[in-house]
Each structure stands twice: as C-alpha cells, then as structure tokens.
Amino acid sequence: MKTALFLVFALAFIAVEGKFSKACSKPGQTVLAPDGCNHCRCSKNGIIMGCTKKMCPPRTMKQSCKPGATFKHKDGCNTCKCSDDGKSARCTARLCW
C-alpha cells in the first residue's frame, strides 16, 4: 500500500513537472498555475516545487449556453454544465495532465 501511494505521488510530481518545465526559467520564480489563479514556485534546479491550492473565483462567461447542456472546458479535461438560465456554468476542477 505504501509503495502504491508513493508511486501515485511520484507520477503526479513528474506530470506536474513536465507541464511546467518551460515556465520555470529562474530558480525561486513564481509562475501562474494552469487554473489561472493559483501560483507555483520553482526550485533551485528549475523544477516546480509546489502550488497553492486556493479556491478560484468563478470566471465570467463570454457567451451564453443552452440551459442544462454539458461541454468540455477549454483545458480539454474538465467538464462544465450550463445553469438553468444559460447565463453561467459550473465546471469540474480536476488537475489535468
């Protein structure tokens, strides 16, 4: 069980590291996370050490949607559902790899 948990965390770290590898050009640099509101810190060797995990404020929609309809978020991995009035949507907040 401990080995399985270690592997999960190691794979998650590698995936996050790969997603941000171009963003960390300077040690100690802080970069914007893919969600657009959290921040990640770069280690001395230019690898992401960790990111904040705060709740992000809802984003405003630039267009309306069909009430009750579901659609893919622009990140390609989260799913959104349109509100009953078609003026807002709620999306899942999974970390995308």
UniProtKB/Swiss-Prot annotation:
InterPro entries: Pacifastin_dom, Pacifastin_dom_sf. PROSITE patterns: PACIFASTIN. GO terms for cellular component: extracellular region. Residues 57-59 are annotated as: Pro-Pro-Arg motif necessary for proteolytic processing. It comes from Platymeris rhadamanthus (Red spot assassin bug). Belongs to the protease inhibitor I19 family. This is U-reduvitoxin-Pr10a. Pfam families: Pacifastin_I.
